[in-house]
Amino acid sequence: RFLPDSELSQLNRSAGAWADVSDDLLDLLRQSMDFWRATHGLFDPSILSDLKRAGYDRSMDDIRARGDQPPTIPASLPTPRPSFSEIELDLPRKRVRMPRGMELDLGGIAKGWIAEHAARVLAADGEACAVNAGGDMYFLGHPADEDDWLVDLEDPREPNSILAAFTVDGGGVATSSVRKRTWTQGGQARHHLIDPRTGNPSQSGWLSVTVSAPHLATADVFAKALLIGGGQAVPLLPPDVLFLAVDADGQLAGTLQPIGVIE
């Protein structure tokens, strides 16, 4: 969304009119609508205006260089925005129409979707493959001389330190954390995970959530939905989706079984 000539940026500028889109973007939007329903709206790509208002109005490199300077859009109270349910997908004609005033941010699903596609291309010859896209990981096959893949869980309280580890036999693993993309706005700490119910950065009490699922986009989406919704969102998980949450005291909770915890 930070590239003015990207397909997503062009779509955001076309709100209110039908726009032709590529097969890939159409598939991302279709899956996004399915996940929006499955998470009862906790995953909502239409929160871009709230992200900008919170100060995430440019890339993290620019934000860090800017420091505590005012964002392009001044901080303000959340304002009503169109519901994601109002977007229209014309699958046969490969076109999309968003209501006026809607802006999309697909960062909550696109990285996982792309990483899994990359892994499948790399493993087309049948070899085992692991792709790590900045914390979003997808595994195909089995590692050499091992049955499962070993995954380290970073401690969100101490960057670059490991809190625990677990194993998976394949599929996707994604982690969302309120400590990864942070900045200050008017002296107030902010992060990039917007609660669609309030329009503000989420405050569920969990610092990070790691999710294992058959597909990486699924893990990506539910990691964010759980981090935003907290324990109340756990019943929304499909049976084949497991998670591990870390709170402010470093305590672990979830259905994903760690094989070791570093004290």
Q: How would you name each of these model-derived features?
A:
Residues R1-E263:
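Mature catalytic core of soluble alpha/beta enzymes
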